Amino acid sequence: MKKQNDFIFGVQYYRAPTPAPQSWASDLKNIKDNGFNTVKFWVQWGWTHRDENEFYFDDMDKLMDLAYENGLKVTLNVIFDVAPVWIFKKYPESKIVLANGSVVEPNAEGHRQIGGFPGTCYNHEKSFEARMEFLKRTVERYKDHPAMHMWDIWNEPEQCGPHRYAKSPELPCFCENCEKKFKEYLEAKYGTIDALNEKWGRCYRNFDDVQMPRDRFTFGDFIDFREFHLDTMTNEANSRIRLAKSIDKNHPVYLHVVPNTSSIFNGLVGVDDFELAKECDVFASTNFATPIWSVLTTSAGKGKTCYNVECHIGSGSTKMHQKQITIKDMAKDLLPQIGMGLRGFMFWQYRPEILGLESPAWGVTKLDGSIGSVGVAAKEFIGKLLPYTDEIANAPAPNPQIAVWKGRKHEIFSYCVNAELQSYAKAVESYVNAAYFNNYNCAVVNDERIIDGLDGVKLLILPMCYEFDSKLAAAVDTFVKNGGTVLCEAHLGGYNADTNRHSYTMPGLGLNELWGIEEEFTTSSYHLKTAVANADDLDTSEFNDDVKKAIDAYGLAGGKCFNIKTSFGFDVLGAERFAALKADDAEVIGTFSKFPCIVKKQHGKGNIIYCGTNLCEAVENDLESFEKFVVKAAEIAGVDRNSAATERGIHLDKVTDNIVIVHNDSDNTVEVALDGNYKALYADCDANGSYAMLPKSAEAFIKA
């Protein structure tokens, strides 16, 4: 495959059956005339593969030719989660089965109007073969077309679209195919039934005895089953990528995810973004303007060209029509994404949808096909940026000195403990935001990245790090000994992922001895008499009956948050968990009621900042102090800010030696220092040494 680092600026155009054929010729001409260089067409399994031996490509043939005639590059997005009718008739056992026994019947949705959604179980072999045949026919047909540019072989992968939110009774998939393959997976992982019994705490006689883990209460079995599904999705992705590459050796092959923020798409019913990115030639995502989306995309796609191939700035529905967009909106949305490492955009979609619940929204144009507010702003945006897009396209993403851990086992463990993922999602995002909006670059790292070493990282943050394993513990210890700083929250390694048992000491996994730090006693913040929030805040609905009875009998003295006095000159809130710490030769930097609960200790060449609470869970109560604490940790670690700007909300990215992007998320006008004389691209004025950034704005500066 030839190396291609194009800056794409395009639109999604065709999701059969819309737009109508009579609009195609004029629309594709107008797409080019309005500044776009790329167009995406959906090739849908159920629309194209209409019978077992019948394929319909007439619409795609015409669209590809029209794109070429208008000088547009084409990405073909191959869509599989709209399975053809004949599949379900021939293989009724291919349907997804939920934990509660419900069968997921094929259906039409607002975003999958042709039906067949969400497709078949990914462990059903015959439907897998049919998917691969459909992909093979598609790639063979268009690999040599002169308009062909890239293959997007999976659109927003997830295990079962109608059930994408983590709820135990609705988790997929428990069909006979999954049960058979899960048992094979366990045998390959554990080798013997005795090894599995030791880990799970069971007494099975053989792997055929294994009962499917339908809920979260004993952790290890549930984590194994969800990881099995994550690996199933990775295998599916790699099969598609490898097949496409084996047929077409000239065009990049990728897929695009909705980044696993844990709030929408997540590790229980989604995919492992880090694993899916590995075999892609480039990597991409559906993206929004908040930092977590771009950071997750470039972190998973580390070292690859990364794109936003579904820009949702024109979102809406029949109930809520889309917003009118200005060039200021466009710059504020897209420029920070470029700063964080994304190298092109495709808008969803060119014409507003007219079929179903997504109508009449999402359009770059108005309903009649004339240019709309999104299109006007997009044309002005790319018109100004175009002379610099080649330079931007080949610029690497920023090199982060802060890394925030997000491990897939630990994400699942967090669900096991909390019966929800929102608290975990907020934990990770809070640390990412604290770095970004205080003018630091950061990345999200998984277990593998930590174990392989964190080149260039000075501060490693471990949010809600209750579950840990020995490989991670050894890697973190090495990182600190070699000069890094780790900021960890309460009960590090309290649950040993190697044994599926709670540790006898915390931190666990021998870190208490290696680091000379011990949690002397622990309790919930809801038992602390001087907590600053009321006990009524506690949701007890997911507690077991015995705990509920005890709470009713004895009551609760505290609340979610409590105040910690720090040696930094400000107080910070802890939340949910409390541990009184004992640490020889350590500096106490935070106390609650005279008990040390945050300590800093040198270890080797580096530092440990050990928190006997979860700071991230108090963010909604005191964001300012939380972020001030993260900044102090960054200073201890020697992390470099991107510029001298220290005002909260200012973020500066030096994309190349000639191009700087500044984002001001604050409510104030801020004078930002620049390292020379620049031109403000969108304000169209000189910026000699400094520039007054307006509130809630972004600007690109080109060196004069």
Q: What residue spans do the PLM features occupy?
A:
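A short, well-structured beta->alpha microelement
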Residues: 262-264, 434-453
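Hydrophobic targeting/anchoring helices
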Residues: 235, 254-430, 521, 550-552, ...
